[in-house]
C-alpha cells in the first residue's frame, strides 16, 4: 500500500481504530476489511536522527505472505510512504493477550480443543520450514482459539523437520503451561512428582490432561474451570 506523503498516511489512519501499541509500532484496525495496519514507531519520531532509524526492507515483511496458517498471523502487504517501508498490513486476529487473561475463567474442555488445533498450526509451520521466535508474549486467545502474532522475526531454516517441530512446539507449550500454573498452582505441581517432570518437558496437552486429573482427584469432583480448584491455590511468585 503506497502513500505519497506522511500526511496522506496520517489522514488515512484517522479513519481507523487505534487498538494498541507494542515494542515495534502502533496498530490500527480497519473494521470494514478486517485488517490491521501496523505503523513502526520510527515513522512518528521526526526528531530521531536518520542514522538511528531502522531501514526496513520489503523482503522482511513479504517473505511469508504466501504462507497459509490458521494459528500464526503473518504480514500480507507492506505500507510505504514514497520509497520508505513504514509498516505492514495483516489480518485481524480476535482475542486477548494470553498473559493478561485470568486462567480461572477458562473452560478447560474448550481450552484442550484449542490447544489441539494450535498444535496443527505448529505442525504446519514446521512443515513450511519456518522457525518461530519470541512466542511467549505474542499469543492471543479468544473465541477463535489461539492466534500467534508479531511474526516478523521468524525465519526460514534448513533445520530438519523433527528438530524444528520440537523447538516450535516447545515455544508454544511453554507459554500454555505457564498460563495454567504460574503464580497459582506452582506449589501443587511441585508436590506431584509426575506433574513436576511433565511441567518441565511435556506436551501441553498431555500436561493439562494429567494436571486436570490430579486436581479433580484432590477435590473429589471434576474440574471444568480452574476456579473449581481455588481451594488448592497457593500464591507464589513465578520463577520460571
Label for each model-derived stretch:
Residues 35, 71, 88, 147-150, ...:
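Protein kinase-like catalytic core scaffold
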Residues 12-78, 102:
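ATP-binding glycine-rich loop module of kinase domains
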Residues 29-30, 92, 140-142:
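Conserved hydrophobic "DFG−1" position in protein kinase catalytic cores
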Residues 1-15:
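A short, low-complexity linker immediately N-terminal to eukaryotic Hanks-type protein kinase catalytic domains
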Residues 100-140, 146:
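Conserved kinase catalytic-core helix
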Residues 141-240:
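C-lobe/activation-segment region of protein kinase-like
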Residues 68-114:
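Conserved structural core of kinase catalytic domains
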Residues 48-61, 114-116, 165-174:
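Well-ordered, non-membrane alpha-helical segments in soluble/globular domains
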